[in-house]
């Protein structure tokens, strides 16, 4: 459930960080055998998470693809929801997102989550995926922060933004 929400929220943040208004997504869902009840449960919960995020963020699914039976020697891959999104930049000639200037100030907007940073570090150090870690996505906060950042872009109060995901802030 949370993995589906996370994938949608990450796409939403990426579009906003480039100064665009999120419009729609396409999904690509990769799972092991649907004949395994645990895998089917993961798939169903992932879709429920994607739906919840899309409804709350007003970010509809317009297309998608599902791939099952992704496994080797009877061992399934980890559930892999991949989300691609499109957004709109109303006036590209005034677009400044991504332009970093020498004297720019840096701000953190929203809550920071040490679990995200710690998870990325632990995965790197162990050189193996860490399973069953459940980092919750606050969709209300995602939407509020996203609208705030877009307003800052539109009012030309910021020239760039970057979302914080896997690696956290260093």
Q: For the regions a protein language model found, what residue spans apply to each?
A:
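Glycine/proline-enriched, intrinsically flexible loops and inter-domain linkers
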Residues: 1-170
């Amino acid at each position: 459930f949370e993995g589906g929400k996370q994938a949608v929220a990450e796409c939403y943040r990426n579009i906003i960080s480039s100064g665009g208004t999120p419009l729609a997504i396409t999904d690509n869902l990769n799972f092991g055998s649907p004949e395994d009840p645990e895998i089917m449960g993961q798939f169903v919960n992932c879709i429920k998470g994607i739906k919840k995020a899309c409804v709350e963020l007003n970010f509809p699914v317009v297309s998608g693809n599902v791939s099952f039976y992704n496994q080797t020697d009877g061992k399934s891959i980890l559930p892999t929801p991949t989300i691609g999104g499109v957004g709109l930049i109303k006036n590209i000639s005034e677009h400044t997102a991504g332009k970093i200037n020498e004297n720019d100030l840096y701000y953190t907007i929203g809550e920071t989550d040490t679990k995200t940073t710690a998870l990325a570090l632990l995965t790197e150090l162990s050189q193996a995926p860490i399973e069953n870690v459940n980092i919750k996505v606050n969709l209300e906060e995602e939407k509020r922060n996203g609208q705030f950042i877009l307003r800052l872009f539109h009012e030309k109060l910021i020239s760039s933004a970057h979302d914080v995901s896997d690696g956290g802030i260093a």
